[in-house]
Amino acid sequence: MSQLELETCNLTLVRYPQVAENSALQAWDAADEYLLRELSTMEIAPGPRLIFNDTFGALACGLQAQSPVSISDSYLSQLATRHNLELNGYDADAVTLLDSMADLPDAPALVVMRIPKTIALLEHQLRMLRKVVTPQTRIIAGAKARDIHTSTLQLFERVMGPTKTSLAWKKARLVHCEWAELKVSEQSLTTEWELDGYGYRIQNHANVYSRNGLDIGARFFMQHLPEQIDGKIIDLGCGNGVIGLAALEANPDATVGFFDESYMAVASSQMNVEVNRPQDVERCSFVVNNGLSRVRRDTLQAVLCNPPFHQLQAVTDEIAWQMFMDARRCLQVGGELRIVGNRHLDYFHKLKRLFGNCETIASNTKFAVLRAVKTNSSR
């Protein structure tokens, strides 16, 4: 829990999932503060206020009196926004939450953006914005100064119009942009590549990890998946769904759920099943969710996971640990959690502590595939 002190208000903000009280990680940074400070000096005409990529709701809380629309690809960010609005005594419904695949309101008066780390997502959002903004729309973006590159500014200018940057303040910088009459060609930001050994054509929306090819951890994991399971399998943190696709093929009597907190990831997974295994769509579910939070206890036969070891730019195992605990809760006795992870992360001892058992299925110089089974003693 941390305090963001502004001239107009003081905000209490927490990360989501929440971290230990003594953690140095906080729910806002200097870019949030700089944006809110700058906005407090601007006169904005009536019209929709759009917020993009508000990580934990700092911008939504600071602008809640203006009934903004907050657009994010992250379900966790949306949960954090609602939680922090309520934590500060605001009406959570004062802020409209839209996912990254939704249509945007027309003619916004203001666009406030946290510049995303993924350049493809930034281009997707700028192209979506170009369809709805007007010459009168005020567009302001922010990020840590080290994350705003020449290529970032060139992208704003190429897609939107004249762009300038502010002076750095607390190691953050702002980008001011104006709409201009430009010839911007239509371009799909969905990538496509062939999954070797399977004959699948994999498509990826802009914010999906490893969007230009199969990452080496997933490739290793796919060689060591469980087979002939008759029950419910979850591909947890599914990304583009390649693990779930392989699980569908190896387990013809199972149902497979594709779960991720990214709207674009779940949409990519659904697209890839529909294109590559249309006969198996009825065996699948596609769910945007916080881990397995909406899954009933003792209902799953297997959980497959390539867990993240960072949230935004912070290295943390909080999300991975939550995934492991969710799996233990939702697995049936005898059901298994199977993961792949970098060897240096030492997931083996974490899983053994949580489940009471863990075995190494396979390993190489960089990755290990681990299996933990739920027993009566690990309920």
Curated annotation (Swiss-Prot):
Main localization, broad class: cytoplasm
Pfam families: MTS
EC number assigned by the record: 2.1.1.174
Organism of provenance: Pectobacterium atrosepticum (strain SCRI 1043 / ATCC BAA-672) (Erwinia carotovora subsp. atroseptica)
Cellular component GO terms held in the UniProt record: cytoplasm
Catalytic activity: guanosine(1835) in 23S rRNA + S-adenosyl-L-methionine = N(2)-methylguanosine(1835) in 23S rRNA + S-adenosyl-L-homocysteine + H(+)
A GO term for molecular function: 23S rRNA (guanine(1835)-N(2))-methyltransferase activity
Gene3D superfamilies linked to this entry: Vaccinia Virus protein VP39
InterPro entries: rRNA_m2G-MeTrfase_RlmG, RsmC/RlmG, SAM-dependent_MTases_sf, Small_mtfrase_dom
The entry's keywords: Cytoplasm, Methyltransferase, rRNA processing, S-adenosyl-L-methionine, Transferase
Family membership: Belongs to the methyltransferase superfamily. RlmG family.
Subcellular localization, as worded in the UniProt entry: Cytoplasm
Position of the signal peptide: none
Name the record gives this protein: Ribosomal RNA large subunit methyltransferase G
Function noted in UniProt: Specifically methylates the guanine in position 1835 (m2G1835) of 23S rRNA.
